């Protein structure tokens, strides 16, 4: 927390320079020395005020005899009592009040030949009566009356302001429209490539399906030809198990008749039909 002076009408803080062009130093109140503390408070004009251990007085309120120097450092003597206090308001507040008050400049003196400021033309419907008052040598006031015809209003230029934003909007939309068109063309090309790839895959699938059917037909023909070339002597026996778990029927292609293997208790009831 920065140090500051607690004396009335004093606003010195740490880092400022004093009257001797040296940094202002701060000293705590002698809270443990009652008589000396009362002397400090009497010189400050705050006899009924009780300072705390965190409040200080700056070196500007002590005379040079209240200090002692050791190795270039300024120390406060044990019996030093502050005696320099300002009873008026601080100069800073005076400067602040002066700066807040705006100087009132006197009005410039009127000149005889000073032209009147021109006011904006106000359209009127009829003649205007103008009264001019001015000091003269003969009488205190001279009244001059004249009739003025109203001026025709100046032609206002055609409003072309709304066209400018429209042109700016068109010029701003041109690049955006071109970018969107390029993007659409790019997407169309990608779609065409995907369609070509899909058609190629469909043709390949049809070709593979046809080849698989042709190979299956060839295998069937080969089996048929091999079966025709083999004689009855070279026929093989095929075993087919059908029915329930108690019936097993064996079929053979050789001249031997088919045999039926079954359990003894089921021979008379379960006979497979030819």
UniProtKB/Swiss-Prot annotation:
The keyword Zinc-finger applies. GO terms for molecular function: DNA binding; zinc ion binding. Keywords: DNA-binding, Metal-binding, Zinc, Zinc-finger. The keyword DNA-binding applies. It comes from the Eukaryota. A zinc finger (THAP-type) spans 1-85. Pfam families: THAP (PF05485). InterPro entries: THAP_domain_protein, THAP_Znf. Residues 83-121 are annotated as: Disordered. PANTHER family: AGAP005574-PA (PTHR46927), THAP DOMAIN-CONTAINING PROTEIN 8 (PTHR46927:SF2). This is THAP domain-containing protein 8.
């Amino acid at each position: 927390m920065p140090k500051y002076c607690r004396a009335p009408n004093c606003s010195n803080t740490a880092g400022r320079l004093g009257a001797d062009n040296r940094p202002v130093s701060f000293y705590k109140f002698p809270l443990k020395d009652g008589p000396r503390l009362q002397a400090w408070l009497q010189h400050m004009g705050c006899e009924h005020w009780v300072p705390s251990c965190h409040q200080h007085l700056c070196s500007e309120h002590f005379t040079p005899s209240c200090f002692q120097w050791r190795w270039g450092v300024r120390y406060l003597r044990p019996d030093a009592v502050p005696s320099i206090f300002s009873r008026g308001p601080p100069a800073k507040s005076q400067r602040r009040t002066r700066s807040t008050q705006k100087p009132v400049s006197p009005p410039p003196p009127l000149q005889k030949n000073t032209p009147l400021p021109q006011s904006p033309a106000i359209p009127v419907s009829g003649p205007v009566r103008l009264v001019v008052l001015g000091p003269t040598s003969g009488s205190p006031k001279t009244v001059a009356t004249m009739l003025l015809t109203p001026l025709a209003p100046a032609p206002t230029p055609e409003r072309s302001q709304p066209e400018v934003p429209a042109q700016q909007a068109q010029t701003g939309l041109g690049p955006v429209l071109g970018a969107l068109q390029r993007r659409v063309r790019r997407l169309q090309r990608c779609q065409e490539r995907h369609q070509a790839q899909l058609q190629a895959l469909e043709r390949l699938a049809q070709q593979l399906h046809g080849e698989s059917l042709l190979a299956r037909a060839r295998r069937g023909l080969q089996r048929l030809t091999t079966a025709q070339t083999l004689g009855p002597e070279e026929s093989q026996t095929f075993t087919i198990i059908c029915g329930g778990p108690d019936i097993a029927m064996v079929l053979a292609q050789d001249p031997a008749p088919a045999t039926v293997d079954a359990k003894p208790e089921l021979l008379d009831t379960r006979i497979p039909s030819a």
